Amino acid sequence: NTLYLNFLRHYLTKIHPKETAYRVKKTTKSAHTRLCPVKKSIKSHPHRSTFRTHCRSQFSTVQSPNPAMSSQINVKIAQDFLAFNQASASEFHCTAEAVSLLKSAGFEQLCEKNKWDIKPNGKYYVVRDQASIIAFAVGGQYTPESPMIGTFAHVDSPCLKLKPISKQSSADMLQVGIQTYGGLLTHTWFDRDLSVAGRVFVNRGGKITSELLCIKDPILRIPNLAIHLDRTVSTDGFKPNTETSTVPILASALADLGFEQLGKTDDADVFKYPADGAKAASSCGKAACGASPAEKLAATFSVKHHSAFLQRIAFELKCEAKEIVDFELNIYDTQPPALNGLYKEFIVGRGLDNQLMSFICTRSMIDAVQSGLESQKSLMLVGLFNHEEIGSMSTTGADGNFLASVLGRINPTALPQSSARSLWVSADMAHALHPNYTAKHEVNHRPMMQKGLVVKVNANQRYASCLSSNAPLMLCAAEHDIPLQDFVVRNDVGCGSTIGAMMSAKTGIKTVDVGVPQWSMHSVRETAGVLDVQSSHKLLTQLYKQYADYEEQFDCSL
């Protein structure tokens, strides 16, 4: 207590020199200590909010009493990710959060439609269709023949997406039709507080703009069937039909009739259905004579979805329902991410696969170029792609031409020479050993939580890792005493894949597949380790800084 209160006194004196009469005082009747101000208490101190913020940053470590966890768990990088994850309710929001990080670090936006003027010491990023981003920094000593070092991840996660015609109803309940996206663990989406997030096309005075939408309130739910009505579910397993059993409930059917009492509240920030809700929303289904093409689109669109739902979207975007032209929306879990475990050593949240690697890759490059860029020889890149969970074959996916297009514009003269000296790091989450299912892992390749980044290897090239691509990463880890783990799948289990193999084949650049180990992959809520986030961020940051030196140490020619 005395040590802590001395810190308070030192801090308060520092931020407010005139208020120097804070002192540690021991009471006469007990051994307790307290901070005794002469003029003002801490509660009334003018810098109270600053004080709280400072304390959070100063005490953002959790000292583990467990001897097995001898080092301090610095949760700062994990807390930064929690904020990133909370704001990334869809792939579009995740891309926008990456843009925010890059802008804050001084990166300049480029547009594919325009000419580029790339200069040494420059930091740039380019976004494609709001769902994929490539950022790069040009070293001050860079030449067209210099090596490239890049880390790549994906922003999408398995989820439920709204159908083009979502309007459904059953048993006097309004429902929204959904499609399953990727290989999600369907049963984990039941009995969750769900909402929608994505992007909406809005007609703003004749110009159609794409606007991000995230309804933070839980407005959807997929209820489980009571065990009394399905007695064999515990013995035969829960096998939901993804077409009929996973249809979320939006509201009672009364809402679509403009029932005046629904949504009524004294809170000005909470959505209220208008008294003429049905008329207000349905009126946009009739295009007036002489309507513009956008207005006609909106009129056609409005009949495909519940009017009450469109009213809620309009409320969030501060527009009218008749101005909504189209949307692309995911269903997401509204429960915030959190630190979990006795020592706050676990991160739990939605979409860790692969928002966590997207965050680590982006932060690692940003931190690597904050100083010393002028002496760098390398071209450093980070790429976040869409549609990995469904094969990556799209304009915003890693199997598209986005990366090749960017590389060609950066280096139109000597790309083959540079590629031969370069390294890609494909970063996608890995499977941590589950204590309840240890037999699922190969006996000698069991990545553990809190034991470091995982290098994935597959003899059939489902992963791109090979001897020449692994070596620089392993050398960097050894130099900085950063742990690495190895993973191969059991021979009697099918092996997954990610973007590494396709990127390596398309660009001819050696690639290593890595990932932070996690539990519950493709669940609505996943788990990873704080220490793995720390060590992975440190490793990739150092690899960015030192790859040009490592590259010169290897000769793979015959």
For each of these PLM feature ranges, what is it?
Residues T2, P17, A31-T33:
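Short hydrophobic alpha-helical segments enriched in small aliphatic residues
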Residues Y4-F7, Y11, Y22, F51, ...:
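Aromatic (phenylalanine/tyrosine) cluster motif
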Residues N6, I15, K26-S30, K40:
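Polybasic, lysine-rich low-complexity intrinsically disordered segments
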Residues E19-V24, A31, V38, V62, ...:
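Acidic, Ala/Val/Gly-enriched low-complexity intrinsically disordered segments
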